[in-house]
Amino acid sequence: MYQDIIRSELNEAADTLNKFLSDEANIAAIQRAAVLLADAFKAGGKVLSCGNGGSHCDAMHFAEELTGRYRENRPGYPAIAISDVSHLSCVSNDFGYDYVFSRYVEAVGKAGDVLLGLSTSGNSANIIKAVEAARAQGMKVIALTGKDGGKMDGLADVEIRVPHFGYADRIQEIHIKVIHILMLLIEKEMVK
């Protein structure tokens, strides 16, 4: 009954992945991001991650696999997803939702740390403000974006962009794959 829809969805996902994979700049950006993160950990830094909606879940997934584990047992790496409900509700109420991540970055981030900001459109005001706060703190920035990069285009040290202009879920599917590859590469880089 739904077989055509299922095939269509999987084919669209495969097409999105293949388009992303065909651009060597994406491969190079993933490698640069992994090395940047590992170098920060080796120097005593940490990573803060943030996103909205499904991207918020991806930011949490990213931090969890750094502090917990990916495929192999190893020491945890310092990572914090900006997801504390009391912080988010306090800042939303007192300052506005645009500041929920930047206030945390200002309080906790320091030079030598990295911010991973996820926005499928590249236009999320609260992610952009977090990037600005990270820059003010002397942090490095990695952005996972989509479409044409939106307003985040050019703001990060490393941008990994999924050039898909349809629904955001296709972009998120590539983002989670990128996150898993980052885990694998960070683990390899940390034992060099």
From Swiss-Prot:
Keywords: Carbohydrate metabolism, Cytoplasm, Isomerase, Metal-binding, Zinc
Co-factor remark: Binds 1 zinc ion per subunit.
One family name in Pfam for this protein: SIS_2
Catalytic activity field: 2 D-sedoheptulose 7-phosphate = D-glycero-alpha-D-manno-heptose 7-phosphate + D-glycero-beta-D-manno-heptose 7-phosphate
Domain of life: Bacteria
Principal EC category: isomerase
Binding locations of substrate: N52, G53, G54, E65, N93, D94, S119, T120, S121, S124, Q172
First-listed, main subcellular location of the protein, grouped into a coarse class: cytoplasm
Protein's UniProt keywords contain Cell division: no
Pathway(s) annotated for this protein in UniProt: Carbohydrate biosynthesis; D-glycero-D-manno-heptose 7-phosphate biosynthesis; D-glycero-alpha-D-manno-heptose 7-phosphate and D-glycero-beta-D-manno-heptose 7-phosphate from sedoheptulose 7-phosphate: step 1/1
Location of the protein in the cell: Cytoplasm
GO biological process, one term: D-glycero-D-manno-heptose 7-phosphate biosynthetic process
Cellular component annotations (GO), alphabetically ordered: cytoplasm
Family: Belongs to the SIS family. GmhA subfamily.
Listed HAMAP family: GmhA (MF_00067)
Additional detail: The reaction produces a racemic mixture of D-glycero-alpha-D-manno-heptose 7-phosphate and D-glycero-beta-D-manno-heptose 7-phosphate.
Described function: Catalyzes the isomerization of sedoheptulose 7-phosphate in D-glycero-D-manno-heptose 7-phosphate.
Name the record gives this protein: Phosphoheptose isomerase
Annotated organism of origin: Erwinia tasmaniensis (strain DSM 17950 / CFBP 7177 / CIP 109463 / NCPPB 4357 / Et1/99)
Organism lineage string: Bacteria, Pseudomonadati, Pseudomonadota, Gammaproteobacteria, Enterobacterales
Gene: gmhA
